[in-house]
């Protein structure tokens, strides 16, 4: 344990302070066309609230103290437009706060907020550059537009066999595109082992079902950027995956019973327990 702590200390000493996560006062400002005079909430990705404001004629300005430097996502959410739950239309946008001032240009349309421009974020600029460099980039908009149109025609207009056929074809095109983009992104890994924006991109492809692959990718990133939020989350995923492997002791967790009481898995030690996921 002492060797691990010493190694972490050495890494920390040689990292420029400006590159590490820290609490910093920042300003977010901009325009969300079509929002009018509504409440806007700055949130963490776990949906915990940071600060609220109210737009005035589509315009907003927020000053807050947040963690910066590790390229974590933040979210702006307009609660009056719709919920954050699973939906094709969510009135929220995600972005990095990696400089003291971020300027956002966005538009509210069909209960969705779409970013049109974002200034002041080097991380977002590099993220967009990498994604635009993919051979498949020129086809993304067309394929997703076709899918959204087919989805609308079948679910909102008429559930005919012809519309179902179009929806299936559009869905298959999306699946093929996603597979191609995955292969292109993984092929770029050797070039971007020091890139936090690339770490954000590639880490989105991992879940609890491909832990071994996730660990191989995580190990290829330079230790100097492993404080990156995406890589820390990936590391946590790997550790949780290993602890849940067959033959390992199940991690302790707490659930609410139908009677409103809290119960821990560890309190049932020595008993047969069925855990239904």
Locate the predicted segments by residue.
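A glycine-biased structural micro-motif
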Residues: 37, 247-248, 270
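N-terminal targeting signals for export/organelle localization
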Residues: 87-90, 103, 176-245
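Conserved hydrophobic/aromatic pocket- or pore-lining residues that grip, position, or stack substrates
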Residues: 201, 253, 275
